Each structure stands twice: as C-alpha cells, then as structure tokens.
Amino acid sequence: TTPIADQRAGVDMLYSSGTTGRPKGVRVPLPEDPAIDQRDPLTNLAMGALGFNVDSIYLSPAPMYHAAPLRWSMRVHKAGGTVVLMEKFDAEGALAAMDRYRTTCGQFVPTHFVRMLKLPDETRARYDLSSMRCAIHAAAPCPIPVKRAMIDWWGPVLIEYYAGSEGNGMTMIDSANWLTHPGS
C-alpha cells in the first residue's frame, strides 16, 4: 500500500451549547506530532484516572452528538477497549446492557441515575452490575441524595467531573473524596 503523505491524527470538532451566544464549532489545532498512534492528553487522563484499557467495556447511554459521549467513547477506543452504544436511554435497558455485556465503565448524567433509582427494587436486583469499576458523570450538578443512593447501590465507583467543550480544563472528584465532602 502507498503511505498517506500526512498521517497525523485528526481531532474532533465539537460544538458549544451556545450558552453565551450562538452555538459554534470549537476548532482544535491538529497535533504537532505526525504519529497517528500517539496518545492525546485526554486519552492519557482516561487511561490513568479512569482506568480505560484494552479490557474496558464502556456503556454509552447518551447520543454521540453530545460532547461527553463522543469524547469518552473515542478515548475507550484509543485505549483499545470496547464501546456499547444504546440507541435510546431506558433505565432498565441500561441495567440490562451493563449485565449482558459486563460493562466496566460508562458515562452518565444525573437524570440517568434518577431514572434507574426509580425502578422497583426487584427490577434493580435482577441485574449484576459487579463488573462496573468506573461510572463517570457530569452535565449537571448531581443532587446529594441521588449521588449517595448511587454510591450505596453501585459502590464507590462514581467519578464526577466538570469540563468544557473547548478543552480548557477539567476537574474530577471520586466517590471516596466526595463522601468526605458531600456536594463537592
């Protein structure tokens, strides 16, 4: 095969929500290093802080046109893992997918948690979620009672983060730290 002259890794172009005006594409410069197999900083973070690797089986219950589902799914692929996509979020369907595919991680929003917590106890108990080691969540503040109930149910696997589509920074808190400072 003939090599392509410029095999630099591409970058995604996400669109802002338009909070401060019209939605616009957030253009990120192409990486300087031409190696397509180089890991970017977000992949390094996902592999380090979140444990994404070749054994990761990631559940994406949200549409890929949103920044977080797209970016986290891309990071799982870059780490060599597997992504399970849901066509549409359904609380019991998410539990069934986690059980069936033995997912190890996923990205959620507080509304997903609320809907899963509203399921009857016997429905929730029907599914084995013991393979989950990382449930990242963002998009809105998670109410203290909801987060506490999720940690009680799934264990200390929740990691909350705050970031922007522009890629200008991120902050994270794991379950252990959150439990010492609820509402953080």
Whereabouts are the PLM-identified features?
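Conserved AMP-binding/adenylation subdomain of ANL enzymes
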Residues: 34-57, 61, 65-104, 119
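Gly/Ser/Thr-rich phosphate-binding loop
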Residues: 12-18, 78-79, 103-108, 117-182
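Short beta-strand->loop structural element characteristic of the AMP-binding/adenylate-forming
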Residues: 24-27, 82-88, 159
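Short Gly/Pro-enriched turn/cap motifs at secondary-structure boundaries
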Residues: 4-5, 181-184
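Conserved AMP-binding A3 loop
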Residues: 3-4, 11-40
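Short beta->alpha linker loops
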Residues: 8, 89-90, 111, 141
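Glycine- and other small-residue-rich loops at beta-strand/loop junctions that grip anionic moieties
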Residues: 2-5, 61-62, 86-87, 139, ...
